[in-house]
């Protein structure tokens, strides 16, 4: 087993234990979705076909990948697709967003996909929604330090700022 995969497994086990302890100690219970990834919209969104045949949209919790027409957007979508497309995945649902998407922690086997995308430098840690998630913060910090992915750019633009600018351009 490669050291990266074994580290992912260790983080998966620790994360799972933390979630189980949280669920046991409070009213928090996580809905878990399992199925096959049948589509990847971008670097932080996917389509999941559940075992029942129902298809649902999923947003990766705590990350914000580049938008279409933004630097690294295609690389992020391709990397996510290579990792999960047409594969069995598990989603620990934390919320449902205003677009009706399930927002959650996505796992492909033992690999925590949200963290993986940050580690590869293909997304920002979305602190607005996941400020206390140290695993995600640490993964982004490592990618930044290594100038990986979006961090190789001289002036990376956060996707939420990119979206805001596009909306302003549309208003003009």
Where do the language-model regions lie?
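N-terminal secretory signal peptides that target proteins for export/translocation
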Residues: 1-2
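Small beta-barrel nucleic-acid-binding modules, primarily SNase/OB-fold domains
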Residues: 5-172
């Amino acid at each position: 087993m490669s050291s990266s995969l074994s580290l992912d497994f260790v983080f998966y086990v620790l994360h799972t234990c933390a979630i189980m302890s949280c669920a046991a100690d409070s009213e928090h219970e996580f809905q878990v979705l399992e199925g096959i990834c049948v589509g990847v919209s971008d670097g932080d969104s996917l389509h999941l076909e559940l075992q029942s045949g129902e298809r649902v949209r999923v947003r990766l919790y705590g990350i914000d990948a580049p938008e279409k027409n933004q630097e690294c957007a295609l690389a992020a979508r391709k990397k996510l697709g290579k990792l999960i497309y047409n594969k069995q995945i598990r989603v620990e649902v934390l919320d449902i967003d205003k677009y009706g998407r399930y927002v959650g922690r996505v796992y492909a086997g033992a690999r925590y996909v949200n963290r993986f995308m940050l580690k590869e430098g293909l997304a920002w840690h979305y602190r607005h929604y996941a400020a206390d998630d140290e695993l995600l913060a640490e993964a982004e910090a490592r990618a930044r330090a290594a100038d990986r992915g979006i961090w190789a750019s001289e002036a990376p633009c956060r996707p939420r700022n990119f979206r805001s600018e596009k909306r302003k351009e549309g208003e003009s």
